[in-house]
């Protein structure tokens, strides 16, 4: 067994861990959007706890072996440079949206009991949080495509942009329930 094989294995395990974290986040955010009581919302918010460990460990386990592989075997090519940039975007989107907004959502639920008031339900359906997780899943799938097909830099960037665009469209279409609630609120 070579060092290359072990490092590649770690790189792939890191990618799997990243998708586990994104899957937990997707499930949690989608369930938060349908929570009817403060207790349900708190239960689902608590499911995000493991992401605080899995996410950073997965990111490091993708990046360090990936950098090693680029430096020792593949060199810097369009697909891995684009993938590295996309990983930075993934981390930035997660930090800018969910890492800042989810704690605020948790605080807004705080001491509430029983059925959620409309204001709290609107916060649980935050379109930025929903869009962020969907777009990050799309970008992550684009990275996997680039790592598999290994296109030149322009092709790699087009793939990443296309995956992000499709994911953004999916987030827009599926995130409309917040608009429905807002309309419901203004009609009351």
Predicted regions and their residues:
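Polytopic transmembrane helical bundles with strong interfacial aromatic enrichment
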Residues: 1-188
């Amino acid at each position: 067994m070579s060092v290359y094989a072990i490092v590649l294995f770690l790189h792939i395990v890191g990618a799997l861990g990243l998708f586990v974290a994104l899957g937990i986040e997707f499930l949690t955010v989608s369930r938060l959007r349908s929570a009817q009581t403060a207790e349900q919302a708190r239960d689902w918010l608590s499911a995000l706890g493991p992401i605080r460990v899995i996410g950073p460990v997965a990111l490091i386990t993708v990046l360090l072996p990936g950098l090693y592989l680029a430096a020792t075997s593949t060199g810097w090519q369009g697909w891995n440079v684009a993938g590295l940039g996309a990983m930075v975007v993934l981390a930035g989107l997660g930090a800018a949206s969910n890492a800042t907004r989810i704690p605020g959502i948790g605080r807004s639920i705080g001491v509430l009991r029983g059925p959620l008031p409309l204001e709290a339900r609107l916060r649980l359906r935050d379109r930025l949080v929903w869009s962020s997780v969907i777009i990050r899943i799309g970008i992550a799938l684009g990275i996997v495509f680039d790592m598999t097909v290994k296109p030149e830099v322009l092709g790699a960037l087009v793939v990443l942009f296309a995956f992000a665009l499709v994911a953004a469209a999916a987030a827009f279409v599926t995130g409309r329930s917040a608009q429905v609630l807002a309309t419901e609120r203004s009609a009351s």
